[in-house]
Amino acid sequence: MTKEFHHVTVLLHETVDMLDIKPDGIYVDATLGGSGHSAYLLSKLGEEGHLYCFDQDQKAIDNAQVTLKSYIDKGQVTFIKDNFRHLKARLTALGVDEIDGILYDLGVSSPQLDERERGFSYKQDAPLDMRMDRQSLLTAYEVVNTYPFNDLVKIFFKYGEDKFSKQIARKIEQARAIKPIETTTELAELIKAAKPAKELKKKGHPAKQIFQAIRIEVNDELGAADESIQEAMELLALDGRISVITFHSLEDRLTKQLFKEASTVDVPKGLPLIPEDMKPKFELVSRKPILPSHSELAANKRAHSAKLRVAKKIRK
């Protein structure tokens, strides 16, 4: 891993081991990031195995071309610079219509959070950006300075689950009427000013949920995850598996619901036999989410909210 792209991989062994890797299998890392999961997965593949890695951040791919060089030289890795919502189209274009496993590590990678100018963090002063793909058009600046009051309230409440969404949106509306809100620090201070004093005494930064909400809006994170996970489940071969790491309740709720719909069947009571075409195509590998160990939590504070869910395809 290059010094410029330092990232501690969360739930490394659990996520990959749960895929039950076949040495000659075709696998996908939908969120390359710091390439930790990819490196471990590749170590389990034989010469016939192949890994396709998606990331919309060119820096992540540049880093992986260094850290995964030995596997690249053997022709075992293909990088795809794109949003994982285009998973099926990009793989089909490469002649891949079936995969043996796929993993997702949702959310922002550590390097993106730590890179000040990306504007993801409320802890560092930076321009309001928050784009995972630097070539996309919508930025946090546009959301904060141009979205109508009602749209801001909706986004803050839906994606940030912040009960002071109206007060925060009103404070933003008042401030931007005087001059544009340009930096993360300006925004964080406005959020703090909109909240009651007793709220500011609670654990955690008062701007965390609102920054999350804006980031999700800028990158359409939930929409992309929904589309991509469904496409991944279609692409999986029989006995293929999907591992999804989430970091907040919205991502986890989405993943849980998709897996539930695919692993259960809604049939009338009293039906003696379930028709074959109505039987669920998936089963849950673990009924409850897999959480980081105590040792991982002690070593990596960013792992504290991580949850891993895994499903297996049992019917085509």
Curated annotation (Swiss-Prot):
- The residues the record assigns to binding S-adenosyl-L-methionine are S35, G36, H37, D55, F84, D105, Q112
Q: Which GO terms describe its biological process?
A: rRNA base methylation
Please name the top-level EC class of this enzyme.
transferase
- Name the domain of life this protein comes from: Bacteria
Q: Which GO terms describe its cellular component?
A: cytoplasm
Q: Which Pfam families match?
A: Methyltransf_5
Gene Ontology molecular function terms on file: rRNA (cytosine-N4-)-methyltransferase activity
Catalytic activity, reaction form: cytidine(1402) in 16S rRNA + S-adenosyl-L-methionine = N(4)-methylcytidine(1402) in 16S rRNA + S-adenosyl-L-homocysteine + H(+)
**Where is the major localization of this protein?**
cytoplasm
The listed locations are: Cytoplasm
Q: What is its EC number?
A: 2.1.1.199
What are the alphabetically sorted keywords of the record? Answer: Cytoplasm, Methyltransferase, rRNA processing, S-adenosyl-L-methionine, Transferase
Question: What task does this protein carry out?
Answer: Specifically methylates the N4 position of cytidine in position 1402 (C1402) of 16S rRNA.
Question: What NCBIfam families has UniProt attached to this entry?
Answer: 16S rRNA (cytosine(1402)-N(4))-methyltransferase RsmH
The UniProt similarity line reads: Belongs to the methyltransferase superfamily. RsmH family.
Q: What is this protein called?
A: Ribosomal RNA small subunit methyltransferase H
Species for this entry: Streptococcus pyogenes serotype M6 (strain ATCC BAA-946 / MGAS10394)
